[in-house]
Regions:
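Sec-dependent N-terminal signal peptides
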Residues: 3-15
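Extracytoplasmic metal-acquisition and chelation regions
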Residues: 16-145
Length: 145
């Protein structure tokens, strides 16, 4: 019985996708370019909003099942990071701006195409760390970004 169960559910494990959460579509777009269909992405907001909005508990439950939360390091994104971490202590919180030199007074570094390439590199490195089986796939997509 256990063997049958294992045989039936093995394909699900082999083809399962990592769930990733982002704050808004720009982060999702970059991740999709590198990971393509290898991850499932959920967005907290469909556009950038500076005010913290309460998320329904059913949505928080869905979001907190993610393996990674990518964000640009903005204050609003950090608030959502705390909320997700409370619900799932295992979630990786990744600040995509951690090694990027920002201009004083302008936190919107992603508008610079050269810095956006650094953001893509950060995403690539994290994806490779969590999914070592697809290193070449991610590398090819990252290089074509």
């Amino acid at each position: 019985m256990i063997k049958i169960f294992f045989i039936l559910f093995l394909p699900l494990l082999l083809f399962s996708k990592y769930q990733i959460v982002t704050y808004f579509p720009l982060e999702s777009h970059i991740i999709k370019k590198i990971a393509q269909n290898e991850v499932k992405i959920r967005e907290i907001s469909s556009r950038f909003i500076e005010d913290f909005r309460e998320i329904p508990s059913s949505e928080i439950s869905k979001l907190s099942n993610a393996k990674i939360y990518f964000h640009f390091g903005l204050p609003i994104e950090k608030e959502y990071a705390k909320l997700l971490k409370q619900k799932n202590s295992e979630i990786l919180i990744i600040d995509l701006s951690s090694n990027i030199k920002k201009t004083d007074g302008n936190p919107y570094f992603w508008t610079d195409p050269f810095l956006l390439r650094e953001v893509a590199k950060n995403i690539y490195e994290i994806l490779v760390d969590i999914d070592k089986d697809k290193i070449e796939y991610y590398k090819k997509n990252y290089e074509s970004f």
